[in-house]
Amino acid sequence: MSVVFVAASKLPTPFGEFTMHGFLDEESGKEHVALSMGDIADGAPVLGRLHSECLTGDALFSLRCDCGFQLEGALAAIAEEGRGVLLYLRQEGRGIGLLNKIRAYELQDGGADTVEANLQLGFGADQRDYAMCQPMLAHLGVSSLRLMTNNPRKVKALESYAITVAERVPLQKGLNKHNRRYLATKAGKLGHMLGSLHQGEAETT
């Protein structure tokens, strides 16, 4: 994978000022972003998150998922610590794209769960790839993370690229009546570590 650094700039946010680093995957043409705060290249494990793009949750305030809540929670945690990094990866809809995500939502409106909808459309349950994270983190001088995630697949992916996950930091945010079944499905079918509440619901949904 050929991921190259393009440019960096300051990015003031409600949580504090980050540095925004832009990267281009020359093979796919996708543009990825890293937001960093503080000295993250000192060798110590860095509080971090891999966040896949979710237009509906991150920008349109959707309550169907927990993505927007996790994005805000991760940025707030980094700002509170004064040091950390968030990789914003252009992998909308767990890798199936925005329009296919809307198609999946339509199937979910008809009774399918989030995994069943993907499969009915001919996709895998989760088509994301995290190979771009290695060159992005290498450019930033990061080799060890305290990873904010509920997804064990992200931990395994990073470790397969020789990035140390020194700690998994739970990021359980945004449970509501609209996403309760969605989160239960992620726990029951995708192995996300969301606590006994979601696991129990997944087993009975």
UniProtKB/Swiss-Prot annotation:
Binding of GTP: at which residues? Answer: R49, L50, H51, S52, E53, Q70, E92, G93, R94, T114, T149, K154
Pathway(s) annotated for this protein in UniProt: Cofactor biosynthesis; riboflavin biosynthesis; 5-amino-6-(D-ribitylamino)uracil from GTP: step 1/4
Q: What EC number(s) would the UniProt record show?
A: 3.5.4.25
Signal peptide position in this chain?
none
**GO BP of this protein:** riboflavin biosynthetic process
The Gene Ontology CC terms held by the record are: cytosol
Catalytic activity entry: GTP + 4 H2O = 2,5-diamino-6-hydroxy-4-(5-phosphoribosylamino)-pyrimidine + formate + 2 phosphate + 3 H(+)
Per UniProt, the cofactor note for this protein states:
Binds 1 zinc ion per subunit.
Q: Specify which residues bind Zn(2+) according to the UniProt entry for this protein.
A: C54, C65, C67
What does it do? Catalyzes the conversion of GTP to 2,5-diamino-6-ribosylamino-4(3H)-pyrimidinone 5'-phosphate (DARP), formate and pyrophosphate.
Q: Which HAMAP family match?
A: RibA
**NCBIfam families registered for this protein in UniProt:** PRK00393.1 (NF001591), ribA (TIGR00505)
Family in the record: Belongs to the GTP cyclohydrolase II family.
Q: What is this protein called?
A: GTP cyclohydrolase-2
